[in-house]
Amino acid sequence: MASYLMQFSFTAQGIQQIKDSPARVEAAKQTVRAMGGEVREFYAILGSAHDTLFILEAPDDAAVARMVLAIGSRGYVRTETHRLFTEEEYGTVIRSLP
């Protein structure tokens, strides 16, 4: 499976209901699992435009797009997602350059 960085920024609704955030994190993890992925790590972030993040694995980009839309549609966070490449994957990409 591929690795992804999914960053979350609270919406006004999300920050107004911040005490419910831990339950929403668990709900988001369940959404990822239900769509064939697995959250490997969760972090809250200081000093960033983002508030929290997941490092996750997923079968493909389409699955991640579904995850982002499902989580974002709840109205508590906005998301920014990036594909991550392991050192081995990065090496494979570099070795394939012409």
Where are these regions (language model features)?
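An amphipathic, aromatic/His-enriched active-site/gating alpha helix that lines ligand/cofactor pockets
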Residues: 58-85
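Short S/T/G/P-rich N-terminal loop/turn motif that feeds into the first structured element of a domain
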Residues: 1-34, 38-40, 44-50, 69, ...
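Short beta-strand-to-loop capping motifs
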Residues: 8-10, 54-59
